[in-house]
Structures are given as structure tokens and as C-alpha cells.
Amino acid sequence: LGDPDLPKREGCYLPGLAAGGVQLQDRFGDLSHPGVSSAEMAFLAAAPTRMEALLIERLPGLLPQLGVDDLAELAKAAVLDTQVSPTINLNGIFELVPADVTTQQALQTMLSELMHQLLAEAAGQGLEESFFLHVAPNLGRDAQGQERIKPAAAGDVGTTDIQFMLTGSIKEAGLLVLLNQHIQRRWGESPLGETFNVRTAPHDPEALLALVQQRIPAERMPLLVGVGDTVTSTASADGTGWLRGGSDRGFLNLLQDLGAWCGRSNRVVLVDSSHGEVDRPSHADGTLRGITDPEDPLRIDTLMPDGPEQYIAWFRQLSERRRVG
């Protein structure tokens, strides 16, 4: 753009939500975190350094062939220092053991134990209800509501990262935040309340759907297009059903259910991010194996097999049409 200050001055940023809806950005690039305490922000700020230290402690036993300097570099690269969702990503480490499923599974177990240690440390500071772990990709939730790790298998590394997230920061709740903001701009009122945010929202998908049905007139619902890249479906070990998960499945299901309720043809778009961006099942052969199944209630309307570049081109085209219209 030539001028680094122009986007902020002219309001060129894309407004929206990040980190499961807990971080808001306006078109001037200003960030806010409704419902988040200063103690929580302080713990999150220190978390990446702590994650790196814990990795350096635990990796030598799993990767004995690496020296101290290599391990330190690997640990640093694995920690993603995002402000409100610090993450450990194993993709770079998995590249060192590409065909060693046993070591890959051991790394996944190590990662889970490490992140649970971080949860315990937060609880020790009086923040026991503040955080949760988001596993990506996952195999849905267990009986305790915890996201299941997708174990590495031949040809599929499974879970690659775990995010340390604020409670309430789920995309389904973020969808309601966006709906509330849209109706406020369009109709001048906030049906879910002026201070509604993901931390005050219900966590259960059925409760979120019921809240919309109770508070928002169906005729005020906009057409929604949901875009995701992480949806999984794996046959259960006993062969009697499917373990469905993926970090985008929940909000895409809710978006679909909202459309069925209000009579809108909401659309679900799935982007193939298996081209080196992350380790995910590919759309290439058209079977969508590992992504969906014949009994899947989530209906995918559009596939973008060429990945992020195809999505960006589509988004630009959509923006041009909107501007012309």
C-alpha cells in the first residue's frame, strides 16, 4: 500500500473474531478482549516461554539423536506465540520422524501431558476455571467433554497441535457474537445484549441454537457462509459408528442448523489445507476419507481442493462483486 499507516487510518482491516471468538478486531485494527481478566492475560503472556521450557525438558527422551542446540531450536519453532491462544504445533517435529508412528504417538502423549501441566499451573494461580485445551484435529469429545486426540497412524499423523485457550472461546459462541453485532448494525438493537460475548455465552450447541431462536426473529437472520478447513470423521474402533470432530465442525453444524430453522440456505465451504500448510486429509481423490462419512449430518456444499490460494481468489471476487453491487 506504500504507507504502513494507511490501513489503520482508512479502516482497511478485516473486522472479525480470532482465538475462538475471544479476541475482537475492528476495521481500524484495534483489538479488544471482552470478559478477559488482567490475571488471565498475564498468564497467557507468560505461557509461550513456559511451553518452550517444558518442551526442552521433555523432548530429549523422545528424540535422543538430537543435540541440545537442535532441541532448543525445535522447541522454539514449535511454540506459536499468539496473544490469547498460545499453541504448540508438532508439524516440524513430525518431519523428523515421518514414518515412525510409535514416536509420533509418543509425541502426542507428551504434548497432552505438557499442556495439562500448564492447566495445573494456572489452577495453582487461582485460574482453574479460566482455560481449556483445544486439540486439532480431534476425534470429538469424550464423556468428560474433553477433546480426544486423534492418534497418529500410517499415512495420517493425526493431532498436530494443542491450543491453550480461554474458556468460552469456541467458534460456535463466536458465531453468535457476530450475529449480535450484525443485527445491532442493521436494526439498531442487540438481541443478545450489548455486553454479550463468548465468555457469557452458553457452551452447549443446543443451548446456543435455542438462544438464537428465543432472541432473534427468524426474518432478521442473514444468509451465512461458513468456511473451514478442519473437519474429521473416523470409524470407531468397534466399527459401530463414527468419531466426528475437527475444530470447524461445531460452528459449521450450528450454521447449518440455524439455516434450517430460519429458512436460509446457509452454505458450508471446506478448504483443502493439505498442500503443506498443515497436515490434513486431502480432497484430491474426491473420497473425503477421514473428513466426512455417509451418515455425517454436516453437509459440505463447496470444496476448495486447491487450498488457500483458491479461497483467497474467491474472497476477492466476492468483494469485487459486493463493491460493484
Regions found by a protein language model. Name each.
Residues 71-223, 231-235:
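Conserved acidic, metal-coordinating active-site core of Asp-based
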Residues 1, 39-63, 100-125, 172, ...:
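Well-ordered, non-membrane alpha-helical segments in soluble/globular domains
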Residues 1-83:
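Active-site phosphate-binding/coordination module
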Residues 22-29, 56-66, 127-137, 268-276:
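Noncatalytic linker/hinge segments flanking ATPase motor cores
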Residues 1, 60-66, 138-140, 196-203, ...:
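Short linear motifs at secondary-structure transitions and domain/linker junctions
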Residues 24-26, 97, 234, 278-279:
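Short catalytic/ligand-binding loop motif for oxyanion handling, primarily in non-cytosolic enzymes
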Residues 5-7, 13, 51-52, 75-93, ...:
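Short flexible/disordered coil segments
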Residues 165, 172-325:
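Mg2+-dependent phosphoryl-transfer enzymes with acidic/Ser/Thr/Gly-rich catalytic loops
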